[in-house]
Amino acid sequence: MESVLIRYPAPLRDALLDLRALILETAADLPEIGELRETLKWGQPAYLPKRPRIGTTLRIDGLRGEPTGHALFFHCQSSLGQEFRRHYGDALTILGDRSIILGIQEEPPLEPLRHCIALALTYHLRKRSPA
């Protein structure tokens, strides 16, 4: 995946590589999800548990027409947007039901992002678990 990310302009590339590292680190701390698959979906770097029905796909990319922004995209038909907004509506910029918007010039809020990544990667597991 680094060979894909290396094609981005330097500031955006660095921000996306940092976000990729955060996803990989978070996944490594979640033994219940098993191995993480790193692939391309719609031309964007994408991350999801290899085993089915564990979590939902996360994608990362720059923002079209916005050279200083990038995003963590999640499945728009999931309840993740509502969940992220409930937990971190004041700490994160959540666009609709599909993305968390980040700026390449600012330090991202790591703990809220890490938690949102974990929520996505365990999405189906959590739906099946008793409350």
Language-model features: locations:
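Charge-dense, helix-prone N-terminal extensions
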Residues: 1-131
